[in-house]
Amino acid sequence: AIKSAREQKALRRAIAANDALLAALLPQLRLGLSEWEIRNLLRREADRFGQGEAFDTIACVGANAAECHHVPGDDVLGPGQPLLLDFGVRLDHYCADMTRCIAPQRPRALFRKLHRIVHEANRRAIAAIRPGMTGQEVDEVARSHIGKAGYGKAFGHGLGHGLGLEVHEGPSFSPRGT
């Protein structure tokens, strides 16, 4: 979707609020917090930095971080475990959306390896974007890199999407993207 200059400014403000939310959250994270508690911290910060959540916040630890839309539960954050955060604030009706996977203390070797693969796939996809490309073509750049690394079957979601008044707007960067 094409955004006016006013809409772009509003989206940048929502995304900046989301960045501030993450910066405020990180010092509050500690080992032993449950997914539920972490999600509630995110919700509280979404109220502080925006006008609440743009969508239901996801916080998941350990093996749960591999589930794209895991419902937070009682599992607790342990040393070196991945912590997946998927959250966004709503600010002046515009939605932000951010997914981050972090690890407290020293992340395990597999986490570091997978993080490098995903980071490189994302970098390649962004670098490949050209006028006229479809979302499907951009998604394929990342999907190809992850597949060549041996993890293609684990890539069960799209690469990304546009933002606006709704959290999921066009374009869609996925195998079905336009």
Q: Model-found features: residue ranges?
A:
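Active-site neighborhoods and metal-handling regions in enzymes and metal-associated proteins
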Residues: 1-178
